[in-house]
Amino acid sequence: MYISRNMDHWNTFIETLRTAFKEGKEQEFLTLLLTPDERDAVGLRLQIVAQLLDKNVPQREIQQNLSTSAATITRGSNMLKMMDPDFLAWVKEQVDAETQS
């Protein structure tokens, strides 16, 4: 699991993000903090995770589908190996629900 070098900063970010969502300000908050390229990268990472969780798509095919590097796919794959299976099932459920709507 990701361990920040400064957990106080990370925890402050998480709490502020939580508050932003509660108050309906998540778009503005994340737009303030992330450049357009960073927002694209987060979206790409979610697509990578979704396809990796599908388990029917080989990594090389994911790389070609998303026009990204093998290293990017590998980083996503390595993070999946470190995460709790119940959490990954929840993520898959969320991503699948978004895909259906």
UniProtKB/Swiss-Prot annotation:
Subcellular location: Cytoplasm
One term of GO molecular function: sequence-specific DNA binding
Keyword field: Cytoplasm, DNA-binding, Repressor, Transcription, Transcription regulation
Entry's Gene Ontology BP terms: negative regulation of DNA-templated transcription
Quaternary structure note: Homodimer.
Family: Belongs to the TrpR family.
HAMAP family to which the protein is assigned, alphabetical: Trp_repressor
Function text: This protein is an aporepressor. When complexed with L-tryptophan it binds the operator region of the trp operon and prevents the initiation of transcription.
Protein name (database record): Trp operon repressor homolog
